[in-house]
Amino acid sequence: GTGKSTLLNIISGLIKESSGQVLLNKHNLSNLAEHRRTQIVSRVFQDPSLGTCPSMTVRENLSLALNKGKLLNLRKCLRYKRDFLENLLEGVSLDLKKYLDVQVKFLSGGQRQSLSLIMSCLTNPSVLLLDEHTAALDPKTSNEVIELTNKIVREKNITTLMVTHNLKHALHYGDRLIMLHKGEVVLDVK
C-alpha cells in the first residue's frame, strides 16, 4: 500500500508514470523504446515463475535470457553457450550447475529464484530491480540468494533497487535506505 511495487513498475516501464520523469544518469527512461529500456533495466520478481519458463530446462532458460527472449537461435545458442553457461553457474551456492538439463518446475524455490536472478543479470543491465525477491524463501535460503545477489551486482557493478520488508537485509546490503509511507519518501539515509 505504500507504492513500492508501483514504483518498480514505473521504473521498468510496465506502467506509465502519471507525472514526473524516470531519469538514469540524466537520461529520461520514459522516452526509450521498450526493447532499449529492457536492456537497461532488469527485474527479479517475488515469484520466480514470472521470470522463467517452468517447462523449459535451466539451460534453455539461460539461453533464452542470453538471446534476449528470442527462440530463433535457441539451438545454436545452446550449442555454443554450453561451456559459458556451466562456467556461469560455477560457485552458485544452490548448485544450479548440476541441474542444467532439468526443467525449472522441478527446482526448489531458492534454485528458481537464483536462476531468475542470474537470467536478469546476463545482459549486464545498468539497473536491477528486486521486488521482494527473497520473501517466499526460508531464512537460510533467503540469505544464500541475498549473498548471490550481492556477489553478482558487485562483480557486474549494477545499480540495484531492492524492495524488501527484511530490515536486516536492507541495512546489511544497502548503500542507501529509503522508506516510503503512502507513496511519499519518509526516510532517506545513505
Regions found by a protein language model. Name each.
Residues 12:
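Helix-to-loop junction immediately C-terminal to a conserved catalytic motif
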Residues 20-27:
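Conserved ABC transporter NBD signature motif
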Residues 28-42, 78:
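ABC ATPase NBD coupling module
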Residues 56-68:
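Q-loop/switch helix immediately C-terminal to the Walker
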Residues 128-131:
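Catalytic Walker B motif of ABC-type/P-loop ATPase nucleotide-binding domains
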Residues 139-141:
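Helix N-cap at the start of a conserved alpha-helix in ABC-type nucleotide-binding domains
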Residues 164-165:
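H-loop/switch region of ABC-family ATPase nucleotide-binding domains
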